[in-house]
Amino acid sequence: MSYDHVIYERRGHVAYVTLNRPERMNALDAHSHAELIEIFDDFERDPDAWLAIITGAGDRAFCAGNDLKATAQASANGEQRVGRDARFAAITRSYDCPKPLIAAVNGVAAGGGL
């Protein structure tokens, strides 16, 4: 499956997850969170995926955290979401994943990107 803001690849038993918004320092918006939720749900259920490595595209940032510009725009448009619909904490919402997750931090890691 292909995604807009995240690259997901499986090589052997390793899942590679790349945050792919280098022009926004890989900041996470609601769409990114939705994609990450789907990716990590699939990863957790896949018996052939033994571990995941998450990194950021580009050379400036691993992840700048929440995309504040997108959040402000959504709020101005009346699209503010709360609870599970907010799509935040895509990775950390499930602390009981039995598989290792490795963060290959390459550059800035701030806020929720840390």
How should these model regions be labeled?
Residues 35-41, 68-106:
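An acidic, glycine-rich surface segment that forms the CoA-thioester-binding/catalytic face
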Residues 1-55, 59:
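Conserved CoA-thioester-binding segment of acyl-CoA-metabolizing enzymes
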